């Protein structure tokens, strides 16, 4: 299957320039193509992952991906999709973010073989461009009326936009032109909000490299959820690729909780499963939704891809323990990962009455509420229901003498460590 046909089947194309030309080009040649990300933070979230999944599909089809980390453009900030001016970050912070993103992106692509990926930083070719060179060599090629008509800029005209952000599309166009000239890069991929920036790059390439220069642009649809909420967010915030921000267990749980109405779409977008495999899972969503086979497959595939097989196994073990309530089977290390973001308390290394202990730690707001919850069977210690108001908490209630896991009700967990 032609890579363009595959992307269309997966619902991953929103707009493209010269569709037939691109289709023919990728059939006849191995091409280089790129996608960029600005280091506005020290970690990607799963929303950032979407265009890079497309880039990886091109690599699987035998093409050469170029991953651009925007050390230069990141100093300015892309106005796309922003209602107000971005706050500028220090160069030191941007440099740290660049390195963090390089590590994350390095896990997603293959950097060896005939279709080896490469990683570049646009700061390398932008840092020595003087303001006069910028205005003469590049600014001269851009018509202000055309720039104002771009959706990126037009949406900001009422509230105002600085020249810094207004000029962002010129810098991104410079990137595409540079990669075309020095890396034979023929295609830029981006989100649907990047169309204006991508077409600006194509215009610059034609002006700098000649009218016959062959270059293409492709954008990806905005991924939406069936319930109308923003993709990539959970109740706790963004789902990060950095395991210190979102543990592999939390990452796995995000995917396994996917709505039946969204799961087939996500399987197409995010996994490398074949059409036949996804069709089979789609049937199971219709006939046996309670088994959640599609969600389990999606969660497993994504956790392996972003983290590792070992991380998946650990996430499965934690999930099983929490589902069964047998949290005693978890090691202290697994508890630290699985309960990383639950409310955590530090208790004295001494015995105490359960009711007093819950109130002293702050798990319960009052003795009255604590007695009510214990008496009603709403309190679980290490997975075991405790209804004895006279129970004494001691060393036997600790896992590996480090942690006690408290559950209130069905889902509210607390982690207690000891001084």
From Swiss-Prot:
Domain of life: Bacteria
A GO biological process held by the record: tRNA aminoacylation
Motif 'KMSKS' region: positions: 230-234
SMART domains given in the database record: S4
Annotated L-tyrosine binding sites: 34, 168, 172
Recorded catalytic activity of this chain's protein: tRNA(Tyr) + L-tyrosine + ATP = L-tyrosyl-tRNA(Tyr) + AMP + diphosphate + H(+)
Residues where ATP binds: 233
Gene3D superfamilies associated with the record: HUPs (3.40.50.620), RNA-binding S4 domain (3.10.290.10), Tyrosyl-Transfer RNA Synthetase (1.10.240.10)
Gene Ontology cellular component list: cytosol
Localisation: Cytoplasm
Molecular function per GO: ATP binding; RNA binding; tyrosine-tRNA ligase activity
Keywords: Aminoacyl-tRNA synthetase, ATP-binding, Cytoplasm, Ligase, Nucleotide-binding, Protein biosynthesis, RNA-binding
Renumbered ranges of motif 'HIGH' region: 39-48
Major location (coarse): cytoplasm
EC number: 6.1.1.1
S4 RNA-binding domain boundaries: 352-418
InterPro entries named among the record's database cross-references: aa-tRNA-synth_I_CS, aa-tRNA-synth_Ic, Rossmann-like_a/b/a_fold, S4_RNA-bd, S4_RNA-bd_sf, SYY-like_C, Tyr-tRNA-ligase, Tyr-tRNA-ligase_bac-type
Subunit comment: Homodimer.
Family named by the database record: Belongs to the class-I aminoacyl-tRNA synthetase family. TyrS type 1 subfamily.
Role this protein plays: Catalyzes the attachment of tyrosine to tRNA(Tyr) in a two-step reaction: tyrosine is first activated by ATP to form Tyr-AMP and then transferred to the acceptor end of tRNA(Tyr).
Protein's name according to its UniProt entry: Tyrosine--tRNA ligase
Annotated organism of origin: Listeria monocytogenes serovar 1/2a (strain ATCC BAA-679 / EGD-e)
Taxon lineage: Bacteria, Bacillati, Bacillota, Bacilli, Bacillales
